[in-house]
Amino acid sequence: MINKIINEFSTPFYLYDENIIEEKIRFLNNLNFKFDSKFHFAVKANPNLAILNKINHHNFGAEVVSAGELFKALKSGFDPSNIIFDGPGKTEFDLKYAITQQIKSINIENLEEIDFINEYSLSKGLITNIGIRINPNIDGYTLDKITTGKTGGKFGVSFDQIDFDSISKLKGIKLSTLSEHIGSQITDHHQLIKSYQELIILADGLLKKGISIETLDF
């Protein structure tokens, strides 16, 4: 097959095996969790519109980190309610575009983003769902360049920096999500479980204060 394609098209080119993609998707969708869950595909991993369209048709959501990725997710058919916006490098344009598209959640990485999202949402007569990326101060025991859950890092917000009561009173936003990501290429699953437990404990504590979190984003 590959030789036939090489003869038909000029090289170089990317060749994707649809059967393998669908096999991986089915494996994930068949995992038996004891709670409601949904996988979100990181668009940065492959922004090819045909691939995104295929993934969208298998009940996946999309995770984006820029206005360009959000545009591609929408163009490939993802419903805004199934798109989350992550990343520490959001521009004002990114935020404005995400707000007007009314996506599932904009996960903030610093408290200044909250003020901007609230004010812009109010100016447009909208209420925007946000999440807060929590920095749980848990080491992923991976390479220094890709560990992201320790205090003092550039990713996420520490527990003690967040005034949840004040955030819950803002009229232009709704805090719906708590998010965390302590790093990549982690081989010690105990650290991952520990970080998940910290997020669950935080969500339970907020519920006791009357602040209901709808989604935990791992």
Language model segments and positions:
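A charged N-terminal "starter" segment
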Residues: M1-T128, L170, K174, I201, ...
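Generic beta-structure capping elements
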Residues: P88, R133-N135, H181
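Glycine-rich, aromatic-flanked loop segments that form ligand/cofactor-binding clefts
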Residues: I127-D139
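Active-site loop/helix belt of alpha/beta enzymes
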Residues: N137-F218
